[in-house]
């Protein structure tokens, strides 16, 4: 039996199936009494030490994360980090985020101002990294390095190794 569809339609159908399966598997594995631990303040970051990663081939933005900002909480399973999105003109958007690998969710804790100080995001909530209305960098970072299926990677060292060697698996 042959099945044909427009490439864009097929890719969206496949994305929906994969995202739905992964999301349902992750939700089932999350404890009902889960509670996020106290969020550490935004860490310092160094623009000269960013490890870049590709989000989409068509994106004009360059995304990078500072490995010194990485933390993996053993109590709540959250991977926290500072991500920097840079435009072709050099403008930067610096964000302090957390990834919840067990549910495929992301939360923005703070954004950096041009002077380097942080502004806490009021009423920040966990949102699906698969939500197509959100920027894709969190999902790509989770898949490329931060999460191993529905769990965070074992260590910051492992996270850095995966970012530096994306094809080694």
Question: Positions of the model-derived regions?
Answer:
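N-terminal secretory signal peptides that target proteins for export/translocation
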Residues: 1-7
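Bacterial N-terminal signal peptides
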Residues: 10-21
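N-terminal secretory signal peptides
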Residues: 26-96
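Secreted/processed peptides and extracellular or luminal domains of membrane proteins
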Residues: 29, 40, 107, 151-154
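Short hydrophobic/aromatic-rich beta-strand segments that constitute the beta-sheet cores
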Residues: 81, 106-110
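Short, solvent-exposed aromatic-acidic interface loops
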Residues: 86, 110-117
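A short, surface-exposed beta-strand/turn
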Residues: 95-105
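C-terminal partner/receptor-binding element of secreted or periplasmic proteins
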Residues: 119-169
